[in-house]
Amino acid sequence: MADPRSKELNMLDGPILPRILQFTLPLAATGMLQLLFNAADVIVVGKFSGSIALAAVGATSTLVNLIVNTFIGISVGVNILVARRIGCHDADGVSRASHCAVALSALLGLLMMAIGLLFSRPMLEWMETPADILEKSTLYLKLYFLGVPFTLIYNFGAAILRAYGDTRRPLIYLTVSGVVNALLNLFFVIVCKIDVAGVAIATVISQIISVFLVMRCLLRFDGWAKISLRQIRLYRSEAVQMMQIGLPAGLQSMLFNISNVMVQSAVNSFGADVVAANTASGNIGNFTYTAQNSVYHAAITFTSQNLGARRYDRIDRIFWGSCAAVCIIGVPLSLLSTVFGPQLLSIYIARSDPAYDAIIQNGVIRNYYVIAPYILCGLMDAMCGMVRGLGRAWLPMLVSLTGACLLRIVWIWTLFRWTHTLEMLYISYPISWIVTAAAHAVCYFVIWKKLRAKLEQAAPQTEQA
């Protein structure tokens, strides 16, 4: 019997690009909306508490991404496993994977919360966070990590919905939680005069709301992934498969963020004004990155479902459709962010702030070198998603480790040390994207050519048996 929710989005038939856009646009809107509400933290703090509080929140961003995205990357394993079992019409397998995902996310969330609470200050000190913002950054980070278990449960639940092609409801859930987050930001910062701690508490409360909504959806789900509280447990086989598929994605994210932590440390060497500028520009650029990154998830999900359903003729079309989707989404956003850079940067800091001019000037530098060529990053991620969707979990991680992370670290230790300028630091991003995207593309074409020949050769033998 077919899953009653399997037609949420038909990934196995019809034109590729429109279906990819149908999948990615709500997911992109979800991510951008989440960023919009996260940016509200930064904007409210910058406008009403000054550049020191802005820098304090911003100095934690790469560290938060390092730890949180490492574990969230494992949700890729949930997405691939559930999507492939949907394609194979394995009802029991979808149910077991879904229940295991909820249990695994809670366990990993508690582990990550403990790590964050214990090592927040030592990690910030290792990053050479300026002394005038260290205390506030530590407070923000510890409060943020209290909500991390809810973040993971939400992301694993959303991964189950994405496996069905449902990217609409996560958008609704984040809209609700995001509005609450923005209102609480204003209440805590303006009314209660709690700056850094206030925005952190607001974030945790909004995360709790998003978890409630996604779990409520899964408990009432009318498909194979319907959750029953009594069946939530770690199924050994499913947990191992999720970790085998998702752990490399998590480690890849960690490696990227380790290099970004080193970049943040290099940015810290220029002082609090440049840290604030980097924070504002980074928030602007994250909108483009997140929108493009939705294509990465589409590439994984579409490839996994079609591979499970033996629709091998569609895989190459998914590759080119994913690249086209990146261009359609990424180019306009990058252009808008670059052309209107000064105006967008001015949102994050009060004009009366003594550091206003320096923050705008340094933020524009980052916009030109990082945001303008962001499409390269989007293409790199889409190609990585194709390789991962083919079932190759570790290779994309190794390619990213070599092409992006190590290259960026070596760049900081050599060229940046010799020419200590923001321009020399930021140009390491587009160069690393070009190298890594080219390597992922070569891996995809070589792997798919061999895998397709093997699968098509095995298919007649299976039919005869």
Summary of predicted features, one role per range:
Residues 13, 17-36, 40, 63-70, ...:
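Residue-level signal for short hydrophobic patches within transmembrane helices
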